[in-house]
Amino acid sequence: MRSFEYARPETEAEALELLAEHGGNTAVLAGGTDLMNLLKRDVVQPARVVDIKNIPSLRGIKLHDNGVLIGANTTLDELNEHALAADYRSLLDVIEGIRSTQITANGTLAGDLCQLPHCWYYRNGHGLLAMQDGESLVATGDNRYHAILGNGGPAKFVSASRFAPPAIAWDAKVRIVTQARSASEGVETIGVKEEWLPLEYFFITPKTNSQGVTVLKPGQLITHLWLPAPKETRSATYEVLQLEGLDQPQVSAAACVGIEGGIVRTAKIVLGHVAPTPWIAHEASRWLVGQKLTADIAETAGQMAVAKATPLSHNDYKVQQAQTAVKRALLKATNQLGEVL
């Protein structure tokens, strides 16, 4: 691990000031469950690490009439133990699938959303795109856990976030803050500029190693996640987990469905760990509307969700896994899963 400056601000404005320095070559420390591993491996080499755990405004869960506001520093254990969490079953499904108590005790929701890929080429110093002499190491190498969708460009890794699929299915938004400078009569004022962005637009597929995996620019910070009020929406996440090895799913699917009179009125299906970004199954989601959700209908939705998959040389098994995950997430959301297992 290389040396770096350490800073612990107490306000958003202080954090943004510290993040903007060193040309933006800084890193945010919240739970630290992923960052510390990256630092030890020299995968990231920030000049300064900014610890945001001491900023009071970034912690806690607040109920509003039209939704729930979750602070970036809220741990997974705190979310799991909150009375409101039961209304967002798909998020709790993810927490229940995490084997490491260290991750649930220290890891944060915002930290998960900002995770960098677990691709072994990237984690061993080959860059996000894992290119060597103009050729993809992934395409010709061990690609068992890589993308089966959205992999037509140079990016073959899969999005590492476990909470993005269910949060996107809920139409979540994130609050992003940036340092704002203005001058009046020769006096400079430094403030905080905020933006609310639908989470589905937060993730990007990079075309170069320098682009990153989210829209966050150097000096920007996620402060909160917003989830709309659940109303009559039912949700679930189904993860295909490994018995051993990484505490990461091979594939996941999250579903939010609104049912009235036994008929699906709204639906959104999001796949995880199958593409460089969380993958919204638009066609399958639209097709579900107007259907009575049965095991056969759920299976067809799963088939539609992966119809355009382009597996690599060693990961075609993930197509069937993703199809099954969609089916089971839908049935789990409507309390039918036990009938088909």
What are these regions (language model features)?
Residues M1-L341:
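C-terminal structural segment of proteins
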